[in-house]
Amino acid sequence: MQWYIDKLPALEHVTPILSVCGDDCAVCPRFLARTEEELHETAVFWYNAGWRDHIVSNEEIRCTGCGCRPTCSFMLLPCTREHGVSACRECASFECDKVKDMYIRSDEKKKQCEKACESPEEFLMLYRAFYEKEKNLR
């Protein structure tokens, strides 16, 4: 995603915005994409990275952080609501089977994500966004 690569220098020192599952929204392309072109490129990347089984609409790829959708792919958002916490790490059941499954499912996509990237720098920022969940939740 060229638009994302162009933003990488500015993203290096941004303050993390952690999601329920430990993703860093501050460097997430879905969170950062604003134009129709950026959203479409992001949707194509999500397909190429194996995170979607087809290229979704710009509306579907757009994300403003946890709570912008009624659920999440890991089913953690409804779980945190049920437990009355704002993040998994605050829950008395942390690290439950849902969280452990999320770590596994997330890691399964790492190699395909790296292959979809246009540069090592792009992958490193996406790694920060999506593959430091355990570190971010502790």
Predicted features along the sequence, with ranges:
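Cysteine-centered metal-binding/redox modules
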Residues: M1-R138
